Amino acid sequence: MGKTRDLFKKIRDTRGTFHAKMGSIKDRNGMDLTEAEDIKKRWQEYTEELYKKDLHDPDNHDDVITNLEPDILECEVKWTLESIAMNKASGGDGIPVELFQILKDDAVKMLHSVCQQIWKTQQWPQDWKRSVFTPIPKKGNAKECSNYHTIVLIAHASKVMIKILQARLQQYVNCELPDVQAGFRKGRGTRDQIANICWIMEKAREFQKNIYFCFIDYAKAFDCVDHNKLWKILKEMGIADHLTCLLRNLYAGQEATVRTGHGTTDWFQIGKGVCQGCILSPCLFNFYAEYLMRKAGIKIARRNMNNLRYADDTTLMAESEEELKSLLMKVKEESEKVGLRLNIQKTKIVASGPITSWEIDGETVETVSDFIFLGSKITADGDCSHEIKRRLLLGRTVMTNLDSIFKSRDVTLPTKVRSSQGYGFSCGHVRM
């Protein structure tokens, strides 16, 4: 027990697992860059442009809020500090979370004092508004900056205040967000949405009805959130002015650098977006997405569920092609009003009935017979045997990769058995 991290490190070392490394990249004109300084400049140029504020959208800052929410308690700070995971990369200050664990009560008192000062003045230390972006490769050409997730690393000390702020927002999350939004919410997860889609398809087949799904993909959804629109949305949803002011001042004047394989870039300003890797981002994006869905007129009645959401993964559902297209066009229109753009090339339709070819802004929306939805294969005929076969194949591939470990005489039998038993909890129920 307690050696799981070391065990998986040994397994990776033994298997020789491939780790993607950031090598040469292309400039905006498609030319290869190999020099360290050129690569750093390109990463700064790309990321700065990605998070650049729209010039036509001026800031509207309110005065300091005097009607404050209840003070932060020391026990809140202690609980938050204990909940921060160990062995995580540090932010720009380079201070590891283990230091706060060593200091214990002294760290709690010090952080409580700082957090309470922020709470009263709504002003954040500039060091806590500085972030480090780490590019993580996605599928596609690794030489294109756009094929990377820009994951943010923030100071562990600031995480304490951010987690307290997130906890205070939770009551509004539970009140304002519908059950169809399962992204980053306690007691909900990807399996719930997968089960919902399978159940809907099963019922449609049982009552001999056609069902049409549109799986929407947004282009850089989290990175395109407009801050001023976000503050207005929070106000409309009844979020306390004090909490909104704290959020607004956290995002005002944010700075970032990009950590590349050749060192870090110069610091630059962040003008829009909610950064992937910050625990506040999913919560804020869920409010943002809920607002646009309401504006699109998509509401959840007792007997009418026409969408499922997991953060920015949005699925529209209808019983006819015309109804689905109408829903999609409404969502597209309202999304563009708040700065979000649909990626038509990655937006797919799965239909159990007849459907014609669609074009939006000159691009064809592809109709497919199956789609990987939140990690599970959804087929137009609703047959789950395709997903079962896929899972078996994935499992067989993993076992083949681990063959050298399971056959190794250096690994004891109890260790092999114990590692297999540990996966028992994640097995789902399959109706035979």
Question: What does each of the following model-derived ranges do?
Answer:
Residues 74-83, 110-118, 164-169, 193-205, ...:
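Inter-domain linker/hinge segments that demarcate the starts of reverse transcriptase
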Residues 262, 340-369:
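Short, conserved micro-motifs composed of acidic
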Residues 1, 312, 374-381, 385-432:
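Non-catalytic, peripheral interaction segments enriched in hydrophobic/basic residues
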Residues 220-237, 310-337, 352-356, 377-383:
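Catalytic palm subdomain of template-directed nucleic-acid polymerases
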